[in-house]
Regions:
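A compositional/biophysical signature of low hydrophobicity enriched in polar/charged and small residues
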Residues: 1-142
Protein backbone atom coordinates (compact mmCIF):
# COMPACT_ATOMS: atom_id res chain seq x y z
CA UNK A 1 0.00 0.00 0.00
CA UNK A 2 1.29 3.41 -0.96
CA UNK A 3 1.57 5.85 1.95
CA UNK A 4 -0.84 8.78 1.86
CA UNK A 5 0.53 11.79 0.05
CA UNK A 6 -0.14 15.32 1.19
CA UNK A 7 -1.74 17.26 -1.63
CA UNK A 8 -1.30 20.99 -1.80
CA UNK A 9 -3.61 23.51 -3.45
CA UNK A 10 -1.89 23.12 -6.84
CA UNK A 11 -2.29 19.33 -6.79
CA UNK A 12 -5.96 19.67 -5.82
CA UNK A 13 -6.54 22.26 -8.56
CA UNK A 14 -4.95 19.97 -11.16
CA UNK A 15 -7.09 17.05 -10.02
CA UNK A 16 -10.24 19.19 -10.08
CA UNK A 17 -9.45 20.39 -13.60
CA UNK A 18 -8.77 16.83 -14.81
CA UNK A 19 -11.99 15.58 -13.22
CA UNK A 20 -13.81 18.27 -15.16
CA UNK A 21 -12.00 17.47 -18.44
CA UNK A 22 -9.50 14.61 -18.49
CA UNK A 23 -8.58 15.57 -22.07
CA UNK A 24 -7.41 19.07 -21.13
CA UNK A 25 -3.96 19.86 -22.48
CA UNK A 26 -1.15 20.64 -20.10
CA UNK A 27 -1.03 24.12 -21.61
CA UNK A 28 -4.72 24.62 -20.74
CA UNK A 29 -4.16 23.20 -17.23
CA UNK A 30 -1.22 25.57 -16.78
CA UNK A 31 -3.42 28.58 -17.57
CA UNK A 32 -6.34 27.32 -15.47
CA UNK A 33 -4.25 26.46 -12.40
CA UNK A 34 -1.91 29.45 -12.76
CA UNK A 35 1.43 27.63 -12.74
CA UNK A 36 4.09 26.84 -15.34
CA UNK A 37 3.46 24.03 -17.81
CA UNK A 38 6.53 22.20 -16.48
CA UNK A 39 4.98 22.26 -13.01
CA UNK A 40 1.82 20.67 -14.42
CA UNK A 41 3.87 17.98 -16.18
CA UNK A 42 5.88 17.17 -13.04
CA UNK A 43 2.87 17.19 -10.71
CA UNK A 44 0.79 14.93 -12.97
CA UNK A 45 3.69 12.50 -13.44
CA UNK A 46 4.29 12.38 -9.67
CA UNK A 47 0.59 11.83 -8.90
CA UNK A 48 0.47 9.05 -11.53
CA UNK A 49 3.58 7.39 -10.07
CA UNK A 50 2.13 7.62 -6.55
CA UNK A 51 -1.11 6.03 -7.75
CA UNK A 52 -3.23 9.07 -6.97
CA UNK A 53 -4.11 9.46 -10.65
CA UNK A 54 -4.77 5.92 -11.83
CA UNK A 55 -5.97 6.56 -15.34
CA UNK A 56 -8.17 8.59 -17.62
CA UNK A 57 -11.53 7.47 -18.92
CA UNK A 58 -14.53 8.39 -20.99
CA UNK A 59 -17.81 8.99 -19.17
CA UNK A 60 -20.91 8.30 -21.24
CA UNK A 61 -24.59 8.97 -20.70
CA UNK A 62 -25.96 5.41 -20.28
CA UNK A 63 -29.43 6.34 -21.53
CA UNK A 64 -28.04 7.73 -24.79
CA UNK A 65 -26.68 4.26 -25.62
CA UNK A 66 -29.79 2.36 -24.58
CA UNK A 67 -29.07 1.48 -20.94
CA UNK A 68 -32.31 2.94 -19.57
CA UNK A 69 -32.56 1.37 -16.10
CA UNK A 70 -30.08 1.21 -13.25
CA UNK A 71 -30.60 -1.57 -10.74
CA UNK A 72 -29.14 -2.47 -7.38
CA UNK A 73 -29.14 -6.10 -6.24
CA UNK A 74 -28.23 -7.54 -2.86
CA UNK A 75 -26.93 -11.10 -2.88
CA UNK A 76 -26.44 -13.75 -0.25
CA UNK A 77 -23.63 -16.03 -1.37
CA UNK A 78 -22.76 -19.49 -0.09
CA UNK A 79 -19.68 -19.77 2.10
CA UNK A 80 -16.54 -20.27 0.04
CA UNK A 81 -18.17 -19.12 -3.20
CA UNK A 82 -17.93 -15.33 -2.84
CA UNK A 83 -14.93 -14.62 -5.09
CA UNK A 84 -16.01 -17.04 -7.83
CA UNK A 85 -19.59 -15.72 -7.89
CA UNK A 86 -18.49 -12.07 -7.83
CA UNK A 87 -16.02 -12.61 -10.69
CA UNK A 88 -18.68 -14.27 -12.85
CA UNK A 89 -21.20 -11.53 -12.12
CA UNK A 90 -18.63 -8.77 -12.76
CA UNK A 91 -17.92 -10.29 -16.19
CA UNK A 92 -21.47 -9.51 -17.35
CA UNK A 93 -21.32 -6.33 -19.50
CA UNK A 94 -24.42 -4.90 -17.79
CA UNK A 95 -22.71 -4.93 -14.39
CA UNK A 96 -20.61 -1.89 -13.52
CA UNK A 97 -19.89 -2.44 -9.79
CA UNK A 98 -19.72 -5.37 -7.39
CA UNK A 99 -19.12 -4.67 -3.70
CA UNK A 100 -18.46 -6.73 -0.57
CA UNK A 101 -20.69 -5.29 2.15
CA UNK A 102 -21.56 -5.80 5.79
CA UNK A 103 -25.06 -6.51 7.03
CA UNK A 104 -27.75 -8.83 5.74
CA UNK A 105 -26.20 -9.27 2.29
CA UNK A 106 -22.77 -10.46 1.25
CA UNK A 107 -22.54 -8.46 -1.95
CA UNK A 108 -24.22 -5.51 -3.64
CA UNK A 109 -24.29 -5.36 -7.43
CA UNK A 110 -24.97 -2.27 -9.54
CA UNK A 111 -25.96 -2.80 -13.17
CA UNK A 112 -27.58 -1.05 -16.11
CA UNK A 113 -30.17 -2.79 -18.24
CA UNK A 114 -31.97 -1.78 -21.42
CA UNK A 115 -35.53 -2.59 -20.36
CA UNK A 116 -37.65 -4.91 -18.23
CA UNK A 117 -36.89 -7.93 -20.44
CA UNK A 118 -33.17 -7.30 -20.00
CA UNK A 119 -33.68 -6.97 -16.24
CA UNK A 120 -35.59 -10.25 -16.26
CA UNK A 121 -32.69 -11.92 -18.10
CA UNK A 122 -30.11 -10.50 -15.68
CA UNK A 123 -32.15 -11.62 -12.68
CA UNK A 124 -32.80 -15.14 -13.99
CA UNK A 125 -29.43 -15.89 -15.58
CA UNK A 126 -26.87 -13.95 -13.55
CA UNK A 127 -28.30 -13.52 -10.06
CA UNK A 128 -29.12 -17.25 -9.92
CA UNK A 129 -25.58 -18.49 -10.56
CA UNK A 130 -24.41 -21.47 -8.53
CA UNK A 131 -23.45 -20.08 -5.12
CA UNK A 132 -26.08 -17.33 -4.97
CA UNK A 133 -28.47 -18.41 -2.22
CA UNK A 134 -30.77 -15.39 -2.25
CA UNK A 135 -31.11 -12.10 -4.09
CA UNK A 136 -33.18 -8.95 -4.05
CA UNK A 137 -33.33 -6.43 -6.86
CA UNK A 138 -34.35 -2.78 -6.79
CA UNK A 139 -34.78 -0.40 -9.71
CA UNK A 140 -33.05 2.93 -9.04
CA UNK A 141 -35.52 5.79 -9.53
CA UNK A 142 -33.15 8.77 -9.46
Amino acid sequence: MVPAMDLDDVDRAIIAALLSDARASQRHLSREVGVAQGTITNRIRRMEEMGIIQGYSVVIDPESVGWNMTIMAGLMIAKGKMIDVQQKIAADPRVFSVYDVTGDWDSIVLARVKNRADLDDLTKNVFTLYGVTRSFTHVVLN
